[in-house]
Amino acid sequence: MKQIDLKDQYFGTEIEMTGISRYDAAVAIGRMFGTEPYHIRSYDSWCVKDSDGKTWKFSRDSSIDCERLANGTVIDADGDYSTEMVSPKLEYSEMGKLQEVVRCVKNAGAFVNSSCGMHVHVDASNHTPRSLKNALTIMYCKEDILFKALNVQTRREDEYCQKVRPMVLEKIRRMPNSTITMEKFKRAWYEGNDGSSEHYNWTRYYALNLHAVFSKGTLEWRCFESTLHAGKVRSNITLALAISCLLYTSPSPRDTER
């Protein structure tokens, strides 16, 4: 397989937060970039363009427990405070810009709570059925360690960030590298049906979401707790990029016990 440098991969992220309304978050970022926010109906989002013309969205997410500060006390808030920041497609050289956006919304009043998660997308355009097979096998072998290191909540693991399905992994691992195709891989991932056209297909709720490969063209890691610490945001993204890069060069690992 071809070798890819970590910094040659495109990425994006979704960071869930509360403490700030979607409108106020867009206003703060627009002020930073010198642009005006605008509203779109999709997910009741407020959007703003950066100096490169890329769109940053602040969308509603029903999984977020909405809160805000009142006289220094955290209180319940209405749905306006359900705020998910959706970055545009970024190059590694734009990591600093992302970190400035994170700092900006934090300084404007945003914070995270236990209901908030962070997702990282990595461009899948160079991935192959063999590299995706590597992805599932590596995740299966290392998930317990990864979840412990990232302090993944049991609730998140049970609902939105499940571990690899052993039966699906075994079926894919039995496919010879010489004959495996993306179509065969896709059928195995969806357990016989093609769910790639369904936005909320049930297979998206895994720590490594390969539904995103077939629906969006990205590998998605959903195993991160949300953070507005710019350094931790960078670390989470770099980890996902490093794993993605490893998939191109690793021989298919053995399916060992966790």
Protein language model annotation of sequence segments:
Residues 31, 94-101, 125-150, 228-244:
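Helical (often loop-to-helix) elements that flank the catalytic cores of nucleotide-handling enzymes
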Residues 202-205, 215-247:
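Beta-strand-rich recognition/accessory modules
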Residues 111-127, 218-222:
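Histidine-centered divalent-metal-coordination microenvironment in nucleic-acid enzymes
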Residues 248-258:
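Single conserved hydrophobic/aromatic residue that forms the stacking wall/gate
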Residues 32-37, 105-112, 142-144, 242-247:
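A common structural junction motif
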Residues 57-59, 68, 133-223:
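Aromatic/basic-lined ligand-recognition segments
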Residues 1-108:
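Terminal catalytic/cofactor-binding subdomain
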Residues 73-78, 109-114, 210-215:
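Short glycine/proline-enriched loop/turn "hinge" motifs that connect secondary-structure elements
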